[in-house]
Amino acid sequence: MTDIDYYFRHNWKPDYDKFELTGWKLLDKIDKNAHILDIGCGYNLFKEHFPNLYGIDPYNDKADEEIKFEDYQPHKNFDVFLALGSLNFGDEKTVDNQIKHLYNITKKNDVIIWRQNPGLGDHPWQGVEEIKFFPWSKDYNEHFCSKYNFELKTFMKDKGDRYYVEWSRT
């Protein structure tokens, strides 16, 4: 079992209350009938609020499917993709591969809603010091959007030193 596997299976806990834009407020922002893929859904807390949400997570059996994002092949079309703290780990090559996969499974006008960590290992749980956080920034967002045919629609600070980011597939 890897450090990140152990950390998310045994130590990490969700706390949507501490985020203003990327927490429970998303319930009012996203159309209730949207077809949503929740990437790294954790405990799948949005599932009960959206009838067409499908949650994937490599470390949590509350997901609809326990699978790494890079290995997931959609079983249907989605129009909203949530990455609320899930594609924040590893080096640039790792994140680039994840975004390439995101490009491959999205279509024109799909929306991606992110909670991005700017590289801070500030989780309060034991084992966080072993996790490599990717240093998200506006520059990285612009770089990946340009490279993979997305449009950066929104980049703004959320509470807790995180970024609320929206991309649209062009």
Q: At which residue positions do the language-model features occur?
A:
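Short N-terminal helix/helix-N-cap motif within the alpha/beta-hydrolase-1
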Residues: D91-K93
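A short glycine-rich, Lys/Arg-flanked "PGG" loop and its adjoining helix->strand segment in the class I
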Residues: D96-K108
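A conserved beta-strand element that flanks and buttresses the S-adenosyl-L-methionine
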Residues: L82
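Class I (Rossmann-like) S-adenosyl-L-methionine-dependent methyltransferase catalytic domain
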Residues: M1-Q73, I113-T170
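Short catalytic micro-motifs in class I SAM-dependent methyltransferases
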Residues: G85-F89
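Residues in flexible loops and secondary-structure boundaries
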Residues: H75-N77, V95, F144
